[in-house]
């Protein structure tokens, strides 16, 4: 009788246990994106009509880069680029060269170059903080185009494996 109780208890234990499948919803998960990559975090932002949404541009698991050109396409009918500021990835003994160009047509170019004594950076970090303001309700997409580039210290291209996308929703 006692062994039957153990079998029943063990049976309930196995039946009641649920094996959970992992959810990879973090943009910076390596299982979610192949490095080296340029990505946005958060991938989805919600704000009010006329409100602002901040998005960070990240370099994921890059090796020996000296510069970045990020070309971001956004829905100019629904979004305005309010501000763009340098991230901390290229910070060092000298401030990075950081330039951006946005004429309101839906293309934002960000250029950032490392000026530290070792001339290259490796790892994961934030390149820029971009604040968008909404003009119309609904979803507006943002995406890094294949014209984006990672450069080594000799100006040679480093292939990018993953390009980030995002959505900004105005309610």
Model-derived segments and spans:
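Acidic, low-complexity intrinsically disordered segments
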Residues: 17-171
């Amino acid at each position: 009788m006692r062994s039957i109780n153990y079998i029943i208890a063990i049976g309930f234990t196995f039946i009641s246990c649920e094996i959970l499948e992992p959810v990879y919803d973090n943009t910076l998960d390596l299982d979610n994106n192949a490095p080296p990559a340029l990505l946005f975090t958060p991938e989805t932002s919600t704000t009010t009509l006329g409100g602002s949404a901040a998005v960070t541009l990240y370099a994921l698991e890059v090796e020996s880069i000296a510069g970045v050109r990020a070309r971001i396409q956004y829905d100019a009918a629904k979004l305005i680029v309010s501000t763009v500021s340098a991230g901390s990835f290229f910070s060092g003994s000298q401030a990075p060269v950081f330039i951006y160009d946005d004429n309101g047509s839906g293309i934002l170019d960000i250029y950032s170059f490392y000026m530290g004594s070792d001339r290259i950076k490796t790892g994961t970090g934030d390149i820029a903080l971009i604040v968008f303001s909404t003009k119309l309700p609904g979803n507006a997409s943002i995406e890094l185009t294949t014209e984006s580039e990672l450069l080594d210290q000799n100006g040679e291209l480093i292939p990018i494996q993953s390009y980030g996308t995002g959505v900004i929703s105005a309610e």
